[in-house]
Design a protein with these regions (language model features):
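Residue-level signal for inorganic ion chemistry
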Residues: 31, 119, 148, 206
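SAM-dependent Rossmann-like transferase core, predominantly class I methyltransferases
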Residues: 3-42, 48-60, 205, 219-221
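Flexible, glycine-/basic-rich loop-and-beta segments that form/coincide
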Residues: 195-227
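A generic structural signal for alpha->beta connector loops
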Residues: 12, 67, 92-94, 159, ...
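Conserved SAM/SAH cofactor-binding pocket of Class I
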Residues: 34-129
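Conserved Class I SAM-dependent methyltransferase catalytic core
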Residues: 20, 143-203
Length: 227
C-alpha cells in the first residue's frame, strides 16, 4: 500500500488515498455539490470508496446546516480503512462506517436516513481490469443499479432523497428502476465536458414517495474534463 494525503480544496481539509487502490475522480465532487443538505440530515454514502462524496459534501455544508451525521457503506475494507483515517485526520466526529455487501445492509438502518448519496459503478458486468479491487469500483460486479435503488428505498425515510449519478445513456434505465422502488425523480442535471458537447453523465435526485414532477437543470460543464 502507498498512502498519500491530498487536499480537498475546502478549508484546508484533506483526504487519505492509496495509489494502489481506486482513487476518486471529479464525478464524486460534482455529486457532492449537486446534492442538497437540510438541517439534521442523517446521510448514507453508498459505494463510498475512500469517502470523498460524503467528506466533500460535509465540508461544503457543515457551516450552513446543523446536526449533520453520516454512515459510509463500502465493501472493500482497505478503502473503508482509508475513510476512517480521513475522518480522524480532519477531526470529523459525525461519521460512522459499515463494511460488507450493500445488499445485506443491517436491519437497524431501515428507514433511518433522510439522504442517500451514491456514486456507483457505471459499467455493466464484465471483468477486464487486471486489478479486481479497481474493477469493482467501475463495473457492476458486486452490486447493480437495481440493487442500489432497492437498498436506498429500504434505508430512506418517507420523503428522503437519493442523489445519484451514472452514465447519461442510462437515464431511462435509472428512472425506471428508481420508480420501481418508489423513488420519484425530482431533479435532473446532465454533465458535459465542454459547451455544446454531448453529455456523458447524468445526476438525479429522487424522493421516496414523491409526486411525479421533475426539474431539469441547465447542463453542467465539468471543467476537469477540459484539462
Amino acid at each position: 500500500m502507498s498512502e498519500v494525503i491530498e487536499e480537498m480544496g475546502i478549508d484546508g481539509l484533506q483526504i487519505v488515498q492509496d495509489t494502489d487502490l481506486y482513487r476518486f475522480t471529479s464525478d464524486s465532487v460534482l455529486l457532492s455539490r449537486f446534492a442538497r443538505a437540510k438541517n439534521g440530515d442523517r446521510v448514507a454514502d453508498f459505494c463510498a470508496g475512500s469517502g470523498i462524496v460524503a467528506f466533500h459534501f460535509h465540508a461544503l455544508n457543515r457551516q450552513k446546516k446543523k446536526n449533520l451525521s453520516y454512515v459510509l457503506f463500502e465493501l472493500q475494507e482497505p478503502l473503508l480503512a482509508l475513510s476512517k483515517k480521513t475522518a480522524k485526520l480532519n477531526g470529523f466526529e459525525q461519521f460512522d462506517f459499515c463494511g460488507g455487501r450493500l445488499q445485506e445492509i443491517p436491519q437497524r438502518y431501515r428507514e433511518s436516513f433522510s439522504l442517500v448519496l451514491c456514486n456507483p459503478p457505471y459499467e455493466r458486468g464484465g471483468f477486464e481490469n487486471d486489478c479486481y479491487e479497481k474493477a469493482i469500483c467501475r463495473k457492476e460486479l458486486t452490486v447493480t443499479l437495481e440493487e442500489i435503488a432497492k437498498t436506498a428505498s429500504f434505508a430512506l425515510k418517507f420523503g428522503g432523497r437519493l442523489a445519484i449519478l451514472n452514465r447519461a445513456d442510462r437515464l431511462a434505465e435509472m428512472c425506471y428502476v428508481l420508480k420501481k422502488y418508489n423513488l420519484e425523480v425530482k431533479r435532473v442535471q446532465f454533465v458535459a465536458g465542454k459547451t455544446g458537447a454531448k453529455p456523458y453523465l447524468i445526476m438525479l435526485e429522487a424522493v421516496k414517495g414523491g409526486k411525479p414532477a421533475s426539474e431539469i437543470l441547465p447542463t453542467l460543464i465539468n471543467q476537469k474534463e477540459q484539462e
